Regions:
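N-terminal start-of-domain structural block
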Residues: 2, 22-23
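Long, charged/polar, soluble alpha-helical segments
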Residues: 24-175
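Bacterial N-terminal signal peptides
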Residues: 9-21
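Bacterial N-terminal signal peptides that target proteins for export
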Residues: 1-10
Length: 175
């Protein structure tokens, strides 16, 4: 009988040991909230002042480049909250540019050229955002990973008007 009691004690001790190790798992990590996605008032005024489609798209791409350059500088100095603010402004500019191009006729060659210009720039921006993503602490990583995915979708969205149902441009052939 004492052997049986010793087995119970050993079992209880073993069960107690495993019970204590279960709560030692990592808790939830605190993630940074996503930044506000907006276009600054002065950026919007500069964009609205451009009447030409090509010059407006080029200006929007320059502003996006400035936001990313400032974000890269803030990232290297360890100011991650400032980086997030710049990434939010960057994404706001991307959305604003797509909204502007979407209001124009997608069959117009000038509009298609600007979509192509936007897609080429988004490709280079995406690689820069991926470099920022590699250097970030875990707290900020989720939003930047989502931004990379968003840029992939945006590139596809910029390419879609280039490929329509017809292969050859021009009028439909007569019967």
């Amino acid at each position: 009988m004492s052997l049986h009691s010793a087995g119970h004690c050993t079992f209880c001790l073993l069960l107690f040991t495993f019970y204590l190790s279960c709560p030692a798992q990592d808790g939830d990590y605190e993630l940074a909230p996503p930044p506000l996605k907006f276009v600054a008032k002065d950026d919007k005024e500069r964009l609205e002042s451009q009447a030409d489609l090509k010059s407006r798209t080029k200006l929007a791409l320059e502003l996006m480049d400035q936001r990313l350059a400032e974000g890269e500088r803030l990232n290297s100095s360890g100011n991650f909250d400032g980086l997030f603010r710049e990434l939010g402004r960057f994404r706001g500019l991307v959305d604003y540019t797509f909204g502007f191009l979407g209001k124009n006729d997608p069959n117009n060659k000038k509009v298609l050229d600007n979509y192509k210009r936007l897609e080429i720039s988004l490709r280079s921006f995406m690689s820069r955002v991926e470099v920022i993503h590699r250097e970030l602490p875990f707290k900020y990583e989720e939003y930047v990973r989502g931004l990379v995915k968003y840029l992939r979708v945006a590139r596809t969205k910029a390419l879609d008007p280039q490929f329509s149902d017809t292969v050859l441009p021009g009028d439909k052939p007569s019967d």
